[in-house]
Amino acid sequence: MYTCNITGKKFNLEAGEKNREGGLAFGYNCRFRAVTFLLTKMLYHNVEILSKILINKDIKGLGMSDSAWSVLCEEKYDYVNTFHNFEPKLDIYDEHDVKKFNNLDFIISSDVFQFLLPYPDIQIAFNNLYKMLKPNGFIVFSVPFVYGDHQEYYPNLYDYKIVNHDDENLLVNTTKNGEYEVFNNLKFSGGDDIKLEMRMFTKSSLIQYLSDADFIDIEFHEPDEDMNKFGIFWDNICSLIITARK
């Protein structure tokens, strides 16, 4: 039996469920539990059950992705879960949006940055995460990543649309320089909110982006025995949850 570190309830997992996107219990999978595990550990220097934490509205946080547990975070903290296209809105490339959120204790961004457009520059998104934090504030961050070479699938994406031709989705792009491009074999993911994947990060590229944004204490957290107790398992060492401080 495992204890859900979000709800505090007990649950079982089958062997085949013990992976990043598996292990669903009470609406939360292994990735969600891992994010919450690290959030409480970073805040309290100890692992806490999110539902049982005392309310503290002096702690200010922001979510870019985590509607699955945003209700609990909003209950416990001065916390807002943002969206890209509607209020409360945060376009991480938009300086006006970024200025609305500042002096944050923490930001949660889980599996978002692989969908961000390459224009104007993905580095700007990492820089803006840093800007929104207070000194010593931190991020709990994840994206799919591998070991090897970073891949930008559409590096010159600028003015594009997706069309269907002969039952195949094609991306038709006009670059900033006016050149015409067509791509097939598009990669979509995102669960209920299907989006086009723009890139595949690597561990080294993530370290570079975070370091260039001036983050420190960058850590990639491979599930250990303490995490296993809460039903947190990975099936490989790719796409781990990351924490980093300002």
Task: Annotate each PLM feature.
Residues 1-102, 110, 227, 233-240:
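Conserved N-terminal segment of class I S-adenosyl-L-methionine
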Residues 48-52, 108-111, 188, 208-213:
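A generic short-segment signal for beta-strand/edge and adjacent turn/coil regions
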Residues 54-158, 203-204, 241-246:
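Conserved SAM-binding loop
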Residues 120-134, 138-245:
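S-adenosyl-L-methionine-dependent methyltransferase catalytic module, highlighting the catalytic core
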